[in-house]
Protein backbone atom coordinates (compact mmCIF):
# COMPACT_ATOMS: atom_id res chain seq x y z
CA UNK A 1 0.00 0.00 0.00
CA UNK A 2 0.94 3.66 -0.03
CA UNK A 3 1.80 5.73 3.03
CA UNK A 4 -0.03 8.74 1.56
CA UNK A 5 -3.22 8.64 -0.51
CA UNK A 6 -1.57 9.88 -3.69
CA UNK A 7 1.96 8.57 -3.28
CA UNK A 8 2.87 6.95 -6.55
CA UNK A 9 -0.23 7.95 -8.41
CA UNK A 10 -1.27 11.37 -9.60
CA UNK A 11 -5.01 11.80 -9.84
CA UNK A 12 -5.79 15.46 -9.44
CA UNK A 13 -9.06 16.63 -10.90
CA UNK A 14 -8.65 19.33 -13.56
CA UNK A 15 -8.54 23.03 -12.71
CA UNK A 16 -8.14 22.98 -8.93
CA UNK A 17 -6.33 26.31 -8.79
CA UNK A 18 -7.45 28.97 -6.30
CA UNK A 19 -5.22 31.93 -5.50
CA UNK A 20 -6.01 31.97 -1.78
CA UNK A 21 -7.82 28.76 -0.76
CA UNK A 22 -7.94 29.80 2.90
CA UNK A 23 -10.10 32.77 1.94
CA UNK A 24 -12.69 30.65 0.16
CA UNK A 25 -15.69 29.19 1.93
CA UNK A 26 -18.12 27.65 -0.56
CA UNK A 27 -20.88 27.66 2.05
CA UNK A 28 -20.70 31.46 2.16
CA UNK A 29 -20.07 32.09 -1.52
CA UNK A 30 -22.56 29.54 -2.85
CA UNK A 31 -25.05 29.34 -0.01
CA UNK A 32 -28.17 29.14 -2.13
CA UNK A 33 -26.80 26.39 -4.35
CA UNK A 34 -25.09 24.39 -1.64
CA UNK A 35 -28.13 24.37 0.64
CA UNK A 36 -30.39 23.38 -2.21
CA UNK A 37 -33.48 21.43 -1.17
CA UNK A 38 -33.84 18.77 -3.85
CA UNK A 39 -37.55 18.30 -3.14
CA UNK A 40 -38.45 21.90 -3.89
CA UNK A 41 -36.26 22.71 -6.90
CA UNK A 42 -36.97 21.53 -10.43
CA UNK A 43 -34.08 19.98 -12.33
CA UNK A 44 -34.08 22.66 -15.02
CA UNK A 45 -33.61 25.33 -12.32
CA UNK A 46 -30.36 23.81 -11.03
CA UNK A 47 -27.09 25.28 -12.29
CA UNK A 48 -24.96 22.17 -12.73
CA UNK A 49 -21.86 24.16 -13.67
CA UNK A 50 -22.17 26.08 -10.41
CA UNK A 51 -22.53 22.86 -8.43
CA UNK A 52 -19.34 21.60 -10.07
CA UNK A 53 -17.61 24.85 -9.07
CA UNK A 54 -18.79 24.33 -5.49
CA UNK A 55 -17.24 20.87 -5.46
CA UNK A 56 -13.97 22.12 -6.94
CA UNK A 57 -13.76 24.85 -4.31
CA UNK A 58 -14.37 22.33 -1.55
CA UNK A 59 -11.60 20.13 -2.97
CA UNK A 60 -9.22 23.08 -2.97
CA UNK A 61 -9.72 23.59 0.78
CA UNK A 62 -9.63 19.86 1.56
CA UNK A 63 -13.30 19.49 2.45
CA UNK A 64 -13.67 16.31 0.47
CA UNK A 65 -16.90 14.99 1.99
CA UNK A 66 -18.72 18.20 1.04
CA UNK A 67 -17.08 18.07 -2.38
CA UNK A 68 -18.36 14.54 -2.97
CA UNK A 69 -21.88 15.63 -2.04
CA UNK A 70 -21.75 18.60 -4.42
CA UNK A 71 -20.44 16.45 -7.27
CA UNK A 72 -23.10 13.80 -6.68
CA UNK A 73 -25.80 16.46 -6.78
CA UNK A 74 -24.33 17.84 -10.00
CA UNK A 75 -24.32 14.37 -11.55
CA UNK A 76 -27.93 13.80 -10.56
CA UNK A 77 -29.14 17.00 -12.20
CA UNK A 78 -26.86 17.01 -15.25
CA UNK A 79 -28.74 16.55 -18.50
CA UNK A 80 -25.54 16.54 -20.57
CA UNK A 81 -23.51 13.30 -20.58
CA UNK A 82 -20.19 15.15 -20.53
CA UNK A 83 -21.12 17.20 -17.48
CA UNK A 84 -22.48 14.14 -15.71
CA UNK A 85 -19.30 12.17 -16.42
CA UNK A 86 -17.18 15.07 -15.15
CA UNK A 87 -19.20 15.15 -11.94
CA UNK A 88 -18.83 11.41 -11.36
CA UNK A 89 -15.07 11.51 -12.02
CA UNK A 90 -14.59 14.36 -9.57
CA UNK A 91 -16.78 12.58 -7.01
CA UNK A 92 -14.54 9.55 -7.35
CA UNK A 93 -11.45 11.68 -6.81
CA UNK A 94 -13.01 13.19 -3.68
CA UNK A 95 -13.66 9.70 -2.31
CA UNK A 96 -10.08 8.78 -3.18
CA UNK A 97 -8.82 11.66 -1.05
CA UNK A 98 -10.84 10.16 1.80
CA UNK A 99 -9.47 6.67 1.00
CA UNK A 100 -13.04 5.48 0.39
CA UNK A 101 -12.04 3.10 -2.37
CA UNK A 102 -15.37 1.32 -2.88
CA UNK A 103 -17.17 4.62 -3.36
CA UNK A 104 -14.37 5.85 -5.64
CA UNK A 105 -14.60 2.73 -7.81
CA UNK A 106 -18.37 3.09 -8.07
CA UNK A 107 -18.16 6.75 -9.08
CA UNK A 108 -15.56 6.20 -11.79
CA UNK A 109 -17.46 3.22 -13.17
CA UNK A 110 -20.59 5.36 -13.26
CA UNK A 111 -18.67 7.99 -15.26
CA UNK A 112 -17.69 5.35 -17.80
CA UNK A 113 -21.23 3.99 -17.92
CA UNK A 114 -22.57 7.46 -18.68
CA UNK A 115 -20.03 8.42 -21.35
CA UNK A 116 -17.61 5.60 -22.11
CA UNK A 117 -15.99 7.30 -25.08
CA UNK A 118 -16.37 10.92 -24.01
CA UNK A 119 -14.08 13.71 -22.87
CA UNK A 120 -13.65 12.36 -19.33
CA UNK A 121 -13.27 8.67 -20.16
CA UNK A 122 -9.47 8.68 -19.88
CA UNK A 123 -9.60 10.46 -16.51
CA UNK A 124 -12.20 7.98 -15.31
CA UNK A 125 -10.02 5.04 -16.38
CA UNK A 126 -6.84 6.35 -14.75
CA UNK A 127 -8.63 7.24 -11.51
CA UNK A 128 -10.42 3.90 -11.51
CA UNK A 129 -7.03 2.23 -11.95
CA UNK A 130 -5.80 3.93 -8.79
CA UNK A 131 -8.84 2.99 -6.71
CA UNK A 132 -8.70 -0.62 -7.89
CA UNK A 133 -4.97 -0.74 -7.13
CA UNK A 134 -5.69 0.40 -3.59
CA UNK A 135 -8.28 -2.38 -3.28
CA UNK A 136 -5.65 -4.91 -4.31
CA UNK A 137 -7.17 -5.58 -7.74
CA UNK A 138 -3.86 -5.28 -9.55
CA UNK A 139 -4.82 -6.81 -12.89
CA UNK A 140 -7.98 -4.73 -13.27
CA UNK A 141 -6.01 -1.64 -12.27
CA UNK A 142 -3.43 -2.35 -14.97
CA UNK A 143 -6.15 -2.82 -17.60
CA UNK A 144 -7.81 0.50 -16.79
CA UNK A 145 -4.43 2.28 -16.70
CA UNK A 146 -3.84 0.99 -20.23
CA UNK A 147 -7.35 2.04 -21.27
CA UNK A 148 -6.63 5.58 -20.05
CA UNK A 149 -3.68 6.15 -22.38
CA UNK A 150 -5.46 4.36 -25.20
CA UNK A 151 -8.34 6.84 -24.86
CA UNK A 152 -6.12 9.92 -24.54
CA UNK A 153 -2.47 9.64 -25.52
CA UNK A 154 -1.86 13.23 -24.42
CA UNK A 155 -2.91 12.73 -20.78
CA UNK A 156 0.35 13.03 -18.82
CA UNK A 157 -1.00 11.64 -15.54
CA UNK A 158 -2.36 8.66 -17.46
CA UNK A 159 1.12 7.78 -18.72
CA UNK A 160 2.57 8.38 -15.27
CA UNK A 161 0.05 6.10 -13.56
CA UNK A 162 0.57 3.33 -16.12
CA UNK A 163 4.32 3.69 -15.69
CA UNK A 164 3.98 3.45 -11.92
CA UNK A 165 2.02 0.19 -12.17
CA UNK A 166 4.52 -1.22 -14.67
CA UNK A 167 7.41 -0.48 -12.30
CA UNK A 168 5.52 -2.33 -9.57
CA UNK A 169 4.96 -5.26 -11.96
CA UNK A 170 8.63 -5.37 -12.97
CA UNK A 171 7.93 -4.22 -16.54
CA UNK A 172 10.76 -1.74 -16.42
CA UNK A 173 11.32 -1.14 -20.14
CA UNK A 174 7.63 -0.39 -20.72
CA UNK A 175 7.53 1.71 -17.57
CA UNK A 176 10.45 3.83 -18.72
CA UNK A 177 8.71 4.60 -22.01
CA UNK A 178 5.50 5.59 -20.19
CA UNK A 179 7.29 7.81 -17.70
CA UNK A 180 9.25 9.53 -20.47
CA UNK A 181 5.94 10.17 -22.24
CA UNK A 182 4.56 11.76 -19.07
CA UNK A 183 7.61 14.02 -18.80
CA UNK A 184 7.42 15.04 -22.46
CA UNK A 185 3.76 15.94 -21.98
CA UNK A 186 4.60 18.29 -19.13
CA UNK A 187 4.37 16.14 -16.01
CA UNK A 188 7.08 17.82 -13.95
CA UNK A 189 6.90 16.51 -10.39
CA UNK A 190 9.50 14.74 -8.30
CA UNK A 191 7.42 11.55 -8.24
CA UNK A 192 7.76 10.89 -11.97
CA UNK A 193 11.55 11.14 -11.76
CA UNK A 194 11.57 8.90 -8.68
CA UNK A 195 9.64 6.24 -10.60
CA UNK A 196 11.90 6.69 -13.63
CA UNK A 197 14.91 6.06 -11.39
CA UNK A 198 13.28 2.85 -10.13
CA UNK A 199 12.67 1.73 -13.72
CA UNK A 200 16.29 2.43 -14.66
CA UNK A 201 17.51 0.51 -11.61
CA UNK A 202 15.33 -2.40 -12.70
CA UNK A 203 17.20 -2.34 -16.02
CA UNK A 204 20.59 -2.21 -14.24
CA UNK A 205 21.20 1.29 -15.63
CA UNK A 206 22.36 2.42 -12.23
CA UNK A 207 24.46 5.41 -13.25
CA UNK A 208 21.53 6.95 -15.13
CA UNK A 209 19.23 6.06 -12.24
CA UNK A 210 21.45 7.93 -9.79
CA UNK A 211 21.34 11.07 -11.94
CA UNK A 212 17.56 10.89 -12.27
CA UNK A 213 17.15 10.26 -8.54
CA UNK A 214 19.24 13.36 -7.84
CA UNK A 215 16.88 15.36 -10.06
CA UNK A 216 13.93 13.89 -8.16
CA UNK A 217 15.47 14.92 -4.84
CA UNK A 218 16.08 18.48 -6.03
CA UNK A 219 12.51 18.74 -7.29
CA UNK A 220 11.11 17.34 -4.05
CA UNK A 221 13.03 19.93 -2.03
CA UNK A 222 11.70 22.70 -4.27
CA UNK A 223 8.15 21.35 -3.90
CA UNK A 224 8.49 21.31 -0.11
CA UNK A 225 9.77 24.88 -0.11
CA UNK A 226 6.80 26.03 -2.19
CA UNK A 227 4.45 24.25 0.18
CA UNK A 228 5.96 25.99 3.20
CA UNK A 229 5.79 29.37 1.46
CA UNK A 230 2.11 28.87 0.65
CA UNK A 231 1.14 28.14 4.26
Q: Which residues does each predicted region cover?
A:
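Canonical positions in the second alpha-helix
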Residues: 74, 110-111, 147-148, 181-182, ...
Amino acid sequence: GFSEPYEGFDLDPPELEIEDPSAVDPVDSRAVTDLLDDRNVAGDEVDVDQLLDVGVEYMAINRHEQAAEAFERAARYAEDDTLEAEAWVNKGIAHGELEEWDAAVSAHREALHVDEEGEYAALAHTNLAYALWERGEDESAFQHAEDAVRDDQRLPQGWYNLGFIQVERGQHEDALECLDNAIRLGFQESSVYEEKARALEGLDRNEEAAEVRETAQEMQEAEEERLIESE
